[in-house]
Amino acid sequence: MQKIAVVGSSYFEKYVEQIKTADMFPQVELFFIPDNGAPANIDINFVLNLIEEKAIQAIVLGPFDYERLAPLISIPCYIVLPNLQDFLLLHNRVKDYKKTAVVLSPQYEIDLSSLEQCLHIKYNRFFYSQDGVKDLIRQLKADGYTGVIGNSTSLMHAEKHGMDGYYYFSRKCIEDGINNALQIIRNMERENQYVSEVRSLLESTTCGVIYTDSNMTITYVNKTAFDILHCYRDSVLQKPLTDILPSKIIERLQRSGGQESNIRTNPV
């Protein structure tokens, strides 16, 4: 069973609980990690410890949480962003588009023109900085707006001013995010299985095999090569190829210009 965590607001938490109740992903053990209302408040150590403790394989999260977490973790992160599908699913809930503001982060732009044409409406879009959302909502209220479409932070300030709040992430968006994260995990598992099979073949071959990167730094040496060269793994890995092969052989490899070569050397 694969393990996936969703990081986000209480809205995401509600979606995760609904998805778990509906048993939409029976092959996945789902976890929810709260971001405490804002990326600045997220408990990084708690997230890192939970990933290790639960052996979580991938995370689904929004763009602000991604900025904080992605540089610190080694598992795949799938970013969800509001899309046309989310705005379409909101359509029947919005009371008055003329008095409803779409509050967006300047980090990403969404083209709503096709929906405007199909639904015969006009979205009133406003962009904010992370520190300026509170002042923007206050100004929108003063300008006569009665509703806000936005993220959890925008809705928190909108509700304080008695405005209607419409969360622009739908449950379908989170479902798609989980499904995509699951596909990433499966692809990685298949790739790891393939690498394991190739490594097993290389380890059992009677020919010595050495892999290098483009800088001729050794990245892999099979058992036969170690036996031929009379060396240990730690003594050659990440070392220049010149440390174990004569320069004339390396020159021939470089002149060949290909990724493969039939050049062989006999043990001395």
Segments and roles (model prediction):
Residues 150, 246-268:
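PAS-family sensory/regulatory modules and their coupling/dimerization elements
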Residues 190-223:
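Sensory modules in modular signal-transduction proteins
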Residues 235-248:
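PAS-family sensory/regulatory domains
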Residues 51-52, 138-141:
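Non-catalytic positions within long, well-ordered alpha-helices that form the structural scaffold/packing
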Residues 225-236:
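PAS/PAS-like sensory domain cap-loop motif
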Residues 5-6, 56-62, 102-103, 145-152:
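Periplasmic-binding protein-like
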Residues 2-3, 7-23, 34-46, 64, ...:
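Ser/Thr/Gly-rich flexible loops in soluble cytosolic domains mediating phosphotransfer, phosphorylation
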Residues 143-150, 166-170:
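N-terminal membrane insertion elements
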